[in-house]
Structures are given as C-alpha cells and as structure tokens.
Amino acid sequence: MAEQNNQQKKGGQQQDANQLIQVRYDKLHELQANGKNPFEITKYDVTHHSTDIKDNFESLEGQEVTVAGRMMFKRVMGKASFCNVQDLKGRIQAYVARDEVGEESYADFKKYDVGDILGIKGKVFKTQTGEISIHAQEVTLLSKSLQILPEKYHGLTDTDARYRQRYVDLIMNEDVKDTFVKRSKVISSIRRYLDGQGFMEVETPMLVSNAGGASARPFETHFNALNEDLKLRISLELYLKRLIVGGMERVYEIGRVFRNEGLDTRHNPEFTLMELYQAYTDYHGMMDLTENLYRYIAKEVTGSEILTYGEHTMDLSKPFERITMVDAVKKYANIDFNEVPDTAAAKKLAEEHHIEYEERHEKGDILNLFFEEYVEEHLIQPTFVMDHPIEISPLTKMKPEDPNYVERFEFFMNGWEMANAYSELNDPEDQRRRFEAQEKAFAAGDEEANHTDEDFLNALAIGMPPTGGIGFGIDRMVMMMTNSPAIRDVLLFPTMKSIDK
C-alpha cells in the first residue's frame, strides 16, 4: 500500500510539473505573438559582473551598470519587485519598479519565471537593509527557461542526475562551479610553471596503431578511409620520447587518454594526463621537479602548501619522503624481499599472507602485490616510492648496481598514486628484450601488456640521450586540490551508462 501511495504521489508530482512547464511554453508563445521573442536577441552588452559591483560599490554607487544572468529568485510586491540574478561570479539583487521600467515592461517582468535569463540596466544603490543592488531602468528577457529548476539544491541530490545534468548542477551549486574554476587553475598553473622551466608544449596522436606506454586495455576503432584498425592512446609516452630523439630537449603534453577499464571513485575510462620528458636528467631530477611543481600548484590554486583531503592533512612545505619499494614493504609488512631468493619463495610468501597472484607472476610482480596490499594506504604524506622491480617496468632504465630493479618512482599522497616517473630506457637492444617479455605476458593472458613498437625501437636506435620522464593524472590532482571525494566530481561530463530508452 505504501509503495502504491508513493507511486501515486510521484505521478501527481510529475503531472503538476508538466502543467507548470506548459504554462512556461504558453508564456513564451504569448511573447512571440506580441513580437517579443527572446530568442531573436543576438547580443547584450554587459558592463559588470555581480561581484565586481559589490567589490567596488563605493566607486559605482549611483553609476549606471548593465548585468546579465539567470533569475534565481523573484518577489513581486504590487508596483515594485525584487529579483536575484546569478552570473558567472555570483548573485546580485535588482529592484524593479513599475514607475521606472514602464507599465508594459513591468507587466512582462511579473510573468517571468525563475530560471529565465535576464539583462538588467540600472543604477547601483544600497537598500534600507544594506544590500547592494541595482535599481532597474530596463529589464530585458534574453532567454526563456522552459524547464523547472530545483527550488533548492536538495532538489538535485541524486548524484546520477547531477552528473548527467551537470548544467543544472552548475546552476544550483556554487561549490561545483568553484571546483571547475580550480581545475582550470590547476592546468594553467602547470603550463605556467613548465613554460617557465623551458619546456615546450606539444600535441601527439590520439589514434594509434600500437597503444603503448602503460599497462591498460585500449579502446579499439576502425578507420574507414584507410581500412585499418586503430586504437585510442592509453599514454602519451612513446611519441614524446620520439621528440626527445629529435632534439626537443624539454617537452610536455596535457591531453586525454583512454583506458578500457572499470569505473570507480578514482578511475574514469577517459581522463586527462600530463606527461613531460627532459633530456640529460634522471628520476632524481624528476623528484625535484615534482616537489617544486606540486608546491607551486597548491599555492596558486589553494593559497597554501597545506592540503586537506577528508580526514587527512598533507604538508607539502616539508621535503617529500623518499623510500625504496623494498624498504617500504619491509617497514609496513615486516618482510625483506632482499632475503627472498627467487620466484618460488615469493609465491610461498604470498600464499602464507593470503595474497592472490597469477601463475605467470615472478618475484618482482609479487613484491608489487605486497606493496599494494600493505603499504599504499599508509602513504598519506607526500612520498616518493623508488626502485621498482623490472618485471613491472618495461620502459625504465635498470639500476646499474642491481639489474632486478629499475630507476623508477611513484609519487604517493593520501594513499593514492599521484604520479609515475622513470629514468627512461634508451638502450634499443634492452628495450627490444623488454617488449619481447611483454609479448610473452600478453600470450599468457595479460591483456594489459605492451606490444612491440618497431618505429619506437628505430627511434631509440637513432639515439636518445639520458632522459627523465614523468606522468601526472590531472584529475586526481584536482581531486586533491578541491577535496573532492570522487573523480566524477572533477569531470564536467563523466562517463555514464546510457539510460535505456
């Protein structure tokens, strides 16, 4: 019975909404019949934003201004009314009086609905209650809203609806807009910092025949004109390294990459990656760059080198910790992989600690599994985890003193991997052997393994200088800078399952 009542209530609400929407259409058609079609207006000259007026009231009081935005509130009181208009930067109140705007215009204004986009021209003043406002001389309907906005933000609490109708979410929730303003600042700050360090921004192909540079399944497509199967890139790496070979000593790219993987709070199949490569340095140089870059971005975007995410506070002002993967596992799991003699012993350890592994896994793979299980969650403060096993690092230069490990680091904060960096492998013969090992892994069932890229090997054979490289996930960086709980909160239009028609 309760469910039936809920269905009846929901149906009644939908019927009421449909009636209100029809009233809006009727109002539009009446305006159009009277030669006042708002959709025929092509431009409107705006002189100020709302916050500009509020911040500069003393110099603007009594001056004529023009604003435009969405009407979010209206109160009609006989011969005079108040409304709030929301623009890019905030809201401002307008006082609309019949004697000032004229009888016909005032009659039209009284029929306008919350959600309509208005242009208001008038003089700046302060009401008796002290609110900075505009005394309207002209009110122009610039666009008619034919749908009903939620009355308050609690009218759009369904997260699925918020992501699908981000345009409504942005209107109703100022915090959402602020998040994406900060996202833009993050990206512009990265560009400003790297440009100042002598890096050059470049663009490389998104459609590729061989999707390499990361461990991930690619999306596949078909190029009709060439009758060829292509893939969407999963990384920016291999083309940027080709540019290092070509003599571009410092390059970076900020671009979309695509990985055919699952959805969760930290993963979206298309996301924004920044990769950079610098000739004549190594992974230690990349650590220094990462520290300086993160501090710079935090200061530019948040005004502080102290970040708060959920219950954690991270201090970027102190030197970032540096620890090897072996030492990290020893510290948090009390297991010293330097004392593990071979793959068989590593697998036995995994079984004893109930860590699942695959038959193809070797000692280095299992070290990484222990790291993921026992260490990652503890890495709250900024930490560089260095010297990964060679098995999980096919594009990285070996450590000269121990060929079982490579010159690689992952940057962690809040228990998350935030960046991945290498001393880049530039030995073409070694790289070919790594590709061959990856091909074997693919044949054994690893769908994320890399394939041999002959053109990239040819580029290495031309000669690539010692190089340091790093990749940052922009979306996670924005999550951290805005204290956003999910990656979808920092993507304007995240990937969503299609609604069945």
Language-model features: locations:
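Class II aminoacyl-tRNA synthetase catalytic cores and aaRS-like
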Residues: 1-501
